[in-house]
Amino acid sequence: MASSSNYNTYMQYLNPPPYADHGANQLIPADQLSNQHGITPNYVGDLNLDDQFKGNVCHAFTLEAIIDISAYNERTVKGVPAWLPLGIMSNFEYPLAHTVAALLTGSYTITQFTHNGQKFVRVNRLGTGIPAHPLRMLREGNQAFVQNMVIPRNFSTNQFTYNLTNLVLSVQKLPDDAWRPSKDKLIGNTMHPAVSVHPNLPPIVLPTVKKQAYRQHKNPNNGPLLAISGILHQLRVEKVPEKTSLFRISLPADMFSVKEGMMKKRGEGSPVVYFQAPENFPLNGFNNRQVVLAYANPTLSAV
């Protein structure tokens, strides 16, 4: 499911609504929850629960779903993969063991919804949320995933059924050089420059450009955005070897401020930012990508 060929199959059906316009408050009504029976996920990954006692350890969380779709007098589409990124989290943001337990013991199902005339199916976690949790799906309770699967066009005008046949939780430990916003007071309402790479994925938060760091902390404005926009062509994306759907950006050490972020030096000591993306994500940089301001605190929304 993590392979490029499988993801390309998935992409045939993908035309999701914009990240900013959909997903923030899409909760299943309580009267519908009592009638749903979900499945629990299997687990794959390189999880070491001893890491839960180390505050500077980061993990990437992903759910991979398999969905079968069928309609009257239509050929059944079996095994359509849905790649469902949950986010990247460090131990100082929330205990690792508690997060994994909440994800693995949760019950998941799928629902249909319509947005701008298009029909979608969406994987949901049933139950209540953890208000302060950095992973949006756990924080919001029965929050639907922000990445949705479009119903193939030949099913759009017919009655159809869909079935969630498999769900896998993948937990991947990030290398030691990972940069994350720090746990000190700056994380609260501090805004960082960020790159928006996909309408249904959260922006990639970056350290501040050194010249703009003080101004950004005191009064966020267009300064950090212009500073980042001017150097996007210098940023290069690398696929992390032996990791699924995980990429990194090595930032110029003489250009970015890392004082407010956790970082273990590698090579020249440049900060390294990790993010989740589909396996076929282009590696030719961030030219023409949208630059936004985003909160360092993942429980707050980007603007």
Swiss-Prot record:
Q: Where is this motif: PPXY motif?
A: 16-19
Question: What Gene Ontology molecular function terms does this protein carry?
Answer: structural constituent of virion
Q: What Gene3D superfamilies does this protein's entry cite?
A: Matrix protein VP40, N-terminal domain
**Matches recorded under Pfam families:** Matrix_Filo
Q: Which keywords appear in this protein's UniProt record, sorted alphabetically?
A: Host cell membrane, Host endosome, Host membrane, Host-virus interaction, Inhibition of host innate immune response by virus, Inhibition of host interferon signaling pathway by virus, Inhibition of host JAK1 by virus, Interferon antiviral system evasion, Membrane, Viral budding, Viral budding via the host ESCRT complexes, Viral immunoevasion, Viral matrix protein, Viral release from host cell, Virion
- Any one of the GO CC terms: host cell late endosome membrane
The primary location reported for this protein is virion
Topology in the lipid bilayer: Peripheral membrane protein
> Where does this protein reside within or beyond the cell?
Virion membrane; Host late endosome membrane; Host cell membrane; Host endomembrane system
GO biological process: one example: symbiont-mediated suppression of host JAK-STAT cascade via inhibition of JAK1 activity
Superkingdom assignment = Viruses
Please give the function described in this protein's UniProt entry. Plays an essential role virus particle assembly and budding. Promotes virus assembly and budding by interacting with host proteins of the multivesicular body pathway. The interaction with host E3 ubiquitin ligase SMURF2 facilitates virus budding. The interaction with the nucleocapsid and the plasma membrane may also facilitate virus budding. Specific interactions with membrane-associated GP and VP24 during the budding process may also occur. May play a role in genome replication.
The domain-related comment in the record is: Late-budding domains (L domains) are short sequence motifs essential for viral particle budding. They recruit proteins of the host ESCRT machinery (Endosomal Sorting Complex Required for Transport) or ESCRT-associated proteins. VP40 contains one L domain: a PPXY motif which potentially interacts with the WW domain 3 of NEDD4 E3 ubiquitin ligase and the three WW domains of SMURF2 E3 ubiquitin ligase.
The similarity comment for this entry is: Belongs to the filoviridae matrix protein VP40 family.
Miscellaneous field: Most abundant protein in the virion.
The annotated subunit structure for this chain is: Exists as a dimer until it reorganizes at the plasma membrane into multimeric form. Interacts with host TSG101. Interacts (via PPXY motif) with SMURF2 (via WW domains); the interaction positively regulates virus budding.
Name under which the protein is recorded: Matrix protein VP40
Q: Which organism is it from?
A: Lake Victoria marburgvirus (strain Ravn-87) (MARV)
